[in-house]
């Protein structure tokens, strides 16, 4: 989700490695080809290690097998690896795919390559993360990330019931659409605006647990009595909790998050996270493959935005905020159960 710039030499090395891996249909970048159908659809994720993208790949493969088509896959070596995604698109177009599904790492930098693919007649659908501008792809299949943030903001506000809040926001990175939408949604749900004095600390984490732990430690040094922590995702929530626990403050702080992975839902059940907004990567991918196959067979293109749903998961429901319990969350979660 990060658009962090890299040194030119590093980018070149990553791009060359990704090209070799895709050509070989295997290797450390996660590139592969599966299935024997004449129709080819590509899936390019941000990484191959995050359980969210593992579940997305599983959903795409299941749908490809059902449809009898060939699925080509590739992934960046790290979150923010635009060079590998550029190379993957170019190689998939050369391989004759009819559709490409992509979770863009750099929502702006990837656009020229997407435009070239579309100009050659390839359907391109963004999954999870919209490009900037959003209409750079034919369609977007994703969580309503503003709603995901709003739900946890409403939940936190209801739980606090007017008590003074001192809020830390552990965000993604500047300029990344998903992070901005979730952050803004949380503020809207809590009923505050940017710059509100109740926001006592904001730190970027890249959605990484270790960075989030460091960020939370920094926030606690600045404001020891923080009592609400918004986190961009569940790894960031886990990092925040570790920092709070080390400081002996884990009992008095409300942590809310977004993702709905199995590890995160288990943390809700354990009381580490109070509530999380669950999203559905398998659905994004399966609908994406279905749309790619439809285009290949009929010429009909998916267009616009398809909301793949979001559900607030908590075992401490609050009046006026729709939610489901962790039993529901575990049944619908992604990652190791």
What kind of feature is each model-predicted range?
Residues 2-11, 18, 25-337:
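A residue-level marker of the well-folded mature domains of exported/periplasmic proteins
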């Amino acid at each position: 989700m990060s658009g962090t710039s890299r040194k030119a030499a590093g980018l070149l090395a990553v791009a060359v490695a990704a090209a070799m891996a895709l050509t070989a249909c295997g290797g450390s970048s996660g590139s592969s080809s599966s299935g024997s159908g004449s129709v080819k659809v590509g899936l390019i994720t941000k990484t191959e290690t995050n359980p969210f993208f593992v579940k997305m790949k599983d959903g795409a493969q299941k749908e490809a097998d059902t449809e009898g088509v060939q699925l080509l896959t590739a992934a960046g070596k790290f979150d923010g690896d635009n060079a590998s995604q550029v190379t993957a698109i170019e190689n998939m177009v050369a391989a004759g795919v009819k559709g490409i599904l992509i979770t863009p790492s750099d929502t702006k930098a990837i656009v020229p390559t997407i435009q070239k693919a579309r100009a050659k007649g390839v359907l391109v659908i963004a999954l999870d993360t919209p490009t900037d501008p959003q209409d750079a792809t034919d369609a977007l299949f994703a969580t309503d990330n503003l709603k995901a943030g709003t739900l946890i903001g409403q939940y936190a506000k209801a739980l606090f019931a007017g008590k003074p809040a001192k809020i830390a926001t552990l965000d993604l990175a500047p300029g990344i659409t998903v992070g901005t939408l979730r952050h803004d949604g949380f503020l809207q749900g809590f009923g505050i605006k940017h710059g509100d004095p109740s926001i006592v600390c904001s730190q970027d984490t890249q959605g990484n647990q270790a960075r989030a732990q460091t960020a939370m430690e920094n926030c606690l040094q600045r404001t020891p009595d923080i009592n609400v922590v918004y986190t961009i995702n569940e790894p960031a929530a886990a990092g925040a909790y570790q920092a709070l626990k080390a400081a002996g403050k884990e009992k008095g702080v409300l942590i809310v998050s977004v993702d709905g992975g199995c590890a995160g839902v288990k943390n809700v059940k354990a009381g580490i996270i109070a509530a999380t907004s669950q999203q559905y990567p398998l659905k994004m991918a399966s609908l994406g493959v279905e749309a790619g196959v439809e285009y290949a067979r009929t010429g009909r293109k998916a267009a616009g935005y398809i909301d793949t749903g979001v559900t607030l998961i908590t075992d401490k429901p609050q009046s006026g905020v729709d939610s489901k319990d962790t039993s529901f969350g575990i049944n619908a979660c992604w990652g190791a159960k």
